[in-house]
Design a protein with these regions (language model features):
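Short secondary-structure junctions
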Residues: 30-35, 86-90
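Conserved short beta-strand elements that form part of the metal-binding/catalytic scaffold
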Residues: 32-64, 109-115
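Amphipathic alpha-helical segments
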Residues: 19-32
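N-terminal beta-strand motif that seeds the catalytic metal site of vicinal oxygen chelate
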Residues: 1-22, 63-65, 116-126
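Vicinal oxygen chelate
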Residues: 1-4, 8-16, 45, 56-126
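Short glycine/proline-centered loop/turn elements that form peptide/ligand docking sites
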Residues: 20, 37-42, 95, 118-120
């Protein structure tokens, strides 16, 4: 295999309504919109990560994205719940992460996770 270095991997999400998606990602999740973006294609950025949004193209609704973060998942859960974000799964402690799932306006799922809580039992599905 040829040698190469991956600099970044950033998802491109198909959105049906750019203003609605920008409201969700910017006003609710705290991303910032790129200066060069327009009504059909843009890049939203938070910390050192970005997600591309493409109106009516490049992808399917229902894409899942892992978002690893450093913070209190229970505080984030309460904040998003109070903002009427669709919560698909409340925080659960797994062996790989303490995580929860939320849904954006186009049905894409953001799987938000942080380090597992080793002082608590792991979720086993029962």
């Amino acid at each position: 295999m040829s040698q190469f270095r991956i600099e970044s991997i950033n998802p491109i999400l198909n959105v049906s309504d750019m203003p609605r998606s920008l409201h969700f990602y910017i006003d609710i999740l705290g991303f910032k919109n790129s200066d060069w973006g327009d009504d059909n294609f843009t890049c939203i950025v938070r910390d050192k990560s970005c997600i591309y949004l493409c109106k009516g193209g490049q992808g399917q609704a229902g894409t899942w994205i892992w978002v690893g973060f450093d913070g209190n998942i229970f505080e984030l859960y309460e904040d998003l719940r109070l903002k009427d974000v669709t919560i698909r799964q409340a925080p659960r402690n797994y062996s790989w992460a303490l995580e929860m799932d939320i849904e954006d306006p186009d049905g894409h799922v953001l799987r938000l996770g942080t380090d597992p809580d080793y002082s608590q039992p792991f979720w086993t599905g029962s």
